[in-house]
Amino acid sequence: NQDFFIKMKPFENTKEGAGIVEKMIADVLADNHQFKYVVIGMESTGFYGVHLANYLSTSELLAPFSVRVYCLNPKEVKNYKKSFNDIGKNDGIDSFVIADFARVGRIAIKPWRGSQYLALQRLTRHRMHITECITREKTYMLNNIYLKFSEYALLRNGEHPFSNKYGATAEAILTEFTTNEDIVNSSIEELVEFINSKSKGRIADPEETAKIVQAAARNSYRLDKCLYEPLTISIASSFNCISSFEKELKAIDKA
């Protein structure tokens, strides 16, 4: 029978449990001066292993032994385990396999650098989350725009009156005119003045833009009047959400 320096026992995945593991390793090192450095291998388990890996890799007790923590791909460990004949499966055996995997130098990845890695990972994933929120909100809003202003929603890029479909002028057209009839009943001069005001004079041909918007309003499906206000409120709310998400995106990019 082979003797082990650490007797196998379970511990909770908590700060207290991590402290127990740290002390077990530190006690072995204190009693066995032949060990010059420590390699800790653990299967990568997503969030569940993050705190333990961080704790051990930054341990002051283990620091004098150049502790290196490796979060291993479970598939690699599983494949390595196949090299053992008639070996069972339990936590003790799996721990032995991981330790042997490290002992024979099979680890090819970089040691865990939790703080730097986790910071970048969280920021990158949150940025993706915000981007997906913007995309999802725009898709949701387009459904409401189609219900309220069907022809406007169907205009393609080459036909669309605004270069930015989600800009201030587009938002004003969709939220400040409650019904399509309000646009149809406005004169071209009134629409030109409105467009110039909302775009701050940045639209090259406001009269042509006004004509396109009015034609789209004229050709759109008509709804019962009771539907226009809820749709307008929903569209305005979506614009507010998109604006907030875009502000958050800028803040993340500056981080």
Residue ranges and their predicted role:
Residues N1-A255:
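A detector of single, family-specific signature residues
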